[in-house]
């Protein structure tokens, strides 16, 4: 059922509405508490949309004027010491629950202040739960678990809203409790409710005075001095890609990250571009490092019915003759029909018995699935 206003016009309901206005985020409180809603979009005072189970719905607009939307923005960013005004009309923030907020005001937002809230579940999905929901089958679930335990460097690639962060979180939950994890994010979204040894780092934007910025790249470089067993970067989107690839290639195996790309091949191009933000290296040199550093690229997608899942799993190999990083496809799933097929089996699966991760019989049974 699409979301409906849950505060009745009774004395008790009116008191709850008043308390929401004074202490919470006003008319958005009901949506924030509804676990089935994943995104809230306020387009000025005249338009409110939300995403529920992968589909967009329009809600009754609860704001009487733009002033209420401005008050909402101030309520969010005020405690963080941030501001939004004509000189700085865009801001990113995080709610105490971990939800990510983006606000844009005029003159950039022509029709009034815009607020977008990306919600995150209080309980992170496990690989088991994602498999139960149909994001992938049991064969892929087992492959992903083995890949994490084998300390493969994994990049989760996908478009906006395709479930990259959800999958990254589920993969991270497989990391053994005996290992020290350092997570690095632009806005903290990953959740490690059970792992006993997690250090969470969050980038810091410039202050209102234009100083004090700490970038993802700064944190990646610093994390190498923190004795990490695993480095998890929420999303590679800039010059930090160079340091991430170097870390993956020089002993910090088992690292995880996400990339905004629509295919594993596009991910190579995106990574090469990002590396060049930080160093003027030849493309062939960069692609050779990508082929060396990344063991597995998992492509996520959003299907036409609104569901999310894995549509491709690949590796990378270096083609010396063409001086090019080539996608080595293992598995594909059609993004329309959802029909899937295995093209080949990753060679590293045969290492698992020798590493004590899985018995030879288990691997053989997996190949027959």
Regions found by a protein language model. Give the residues of each.
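P-loop NTPase switch/communication element
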Residues: 121-132, 149, 173-221, 267-271
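Conserved P-loop NTPase nucleotide-binding/switch module
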Residues: 185-187, 191-195, 199, 223-318
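P-loop NTP-binding catalytic core
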Residues: 34, 47-150
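Hydrophobic anchor at the beta1->P-loop junction of P-loop NTPases
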Residues: 156
């Amino acid at each position: 059922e699409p979301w409906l206003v849950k505060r009745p016009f009774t004395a008790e309901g009116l008191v709850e509405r008043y308390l929401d206005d004074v202490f919470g985020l006003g008319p958005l409180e009901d949506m924030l508490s509804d676990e089935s809603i994943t995104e809230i979009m306020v387009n000025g005072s005249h338009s409110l949309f939300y995403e529920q189970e992968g589909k967009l719905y329009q809600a009754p607009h609860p704001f009487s004027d733009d002033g209420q939307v401005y008050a909402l923005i101030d309520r969010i960013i005020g405690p963080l010491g941030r501001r939004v005004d004509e000189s700085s009309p865009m801001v990113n923030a995080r709610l105490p629950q971990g939800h990510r907020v983006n606000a844009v005001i005029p003159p950039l937002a022509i029709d009034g202040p815009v607020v977008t809230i990306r919600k995150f579940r209080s309980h992170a999905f496990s690989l088991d739960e994602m498999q139960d929901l149909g994001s992938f089958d049991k064969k892929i679930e087992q492959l992903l678990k083995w890949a994490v335990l084998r300390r493969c460097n994994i990049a989760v690639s996908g478009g906006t809203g395709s479930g990259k962060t959800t999958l990254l979180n589920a993969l991270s939950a497989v990391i053994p409790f005996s290992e020290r994890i350092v997570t690095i994010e632009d806005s903290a979204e990953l959740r490690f409710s059970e792992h006993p040894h997690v250090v969470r780092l969050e980038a810091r934007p410039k202050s209102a005075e234009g100083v004090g910025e700490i970038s993802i790249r700064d944190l990646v470089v610093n994390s190498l001095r923190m004795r990490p067993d695993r480095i998890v970067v929420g999303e590679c989107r800039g010059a930090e890609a160079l340091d991430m690839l170097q870390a993956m290639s020089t002993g910090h195996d088992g690292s995880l990250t996400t990339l905004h790309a629509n295919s594993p091949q596009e991910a190579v191009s995106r990574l090469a571009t990002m590396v060049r933000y930080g160093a003027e290296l030849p493309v062939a040199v960069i692609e050779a490092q990508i082929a060396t550093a990344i063991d597995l690229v998992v492509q996520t997608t959003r299907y036409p019915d609104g569901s999310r899942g894995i549509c491709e799993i690949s590796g990378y190999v270096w083609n010396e003759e063409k001086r090019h990083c080539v996608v080595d496809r293992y598995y594909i799933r059609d993004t329309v029909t959802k029909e899937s097929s295995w093209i080949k089996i990753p060679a590293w699966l045969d290492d698992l018995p020798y590493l004590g991760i899985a018995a030879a019989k288990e691997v053989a049974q997996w190949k027959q699935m």
